[in-house]
Amino acid sequence: MGGLSIWHWLIVLLIVALVFGTKKLRNIGNDLGSAVKGFKDGMKESEAPADAQQLPRSGSVNVDAKDAARSSDSNKA
């Protein structure tokens, strides 16, 4: 009783087609499809550089930089 059958949906689709016209609906569908495609391409592009931006981890410490940081801290005191 409360659900919509296939006939209800067909009538709604017919009314929408009459109001907007098939050309306008086709343009809306094309725009929506290209927007979804652009979004997916953007998501793929944003995932790839994230892996490339990771810095390689080395087990060594730059002693000169460590000493420079200590000397600047002692100059502040």
Curated annotation (Swiss-Prot):
InterPro entries: TatA/B/E, TatA/E. Residues 43-77 are annotated as: Disordered. It is a single-pass membrane protein. Its main location: membrane. The chain crosses the membrane at residues 1-21. One of its GO terms (molecular function) is protein transmembrane transporter activity. Residues 64-77 have a biased composition (Basic and acidic residues). It comes from the Bacteria. It is found in: Cell inner membrane. Keywords: Cell inner membrane, Cell membrane, Membrane, Protein transport, Translocation, Transmembrane, Transmembrane helix, Transport. The keyword Cell membrane applies. Part of the twin-arginine translocation (Tat) system that transports large folded proteins containing a characteristic twin-arginine motif in their signal peptide across membranes. TatA could form the protein-conducting channel of the Tat system. This is Sec-independent protein translocase protein TatA. It comes from Burkholderia mallei (strain ATCC 23344).
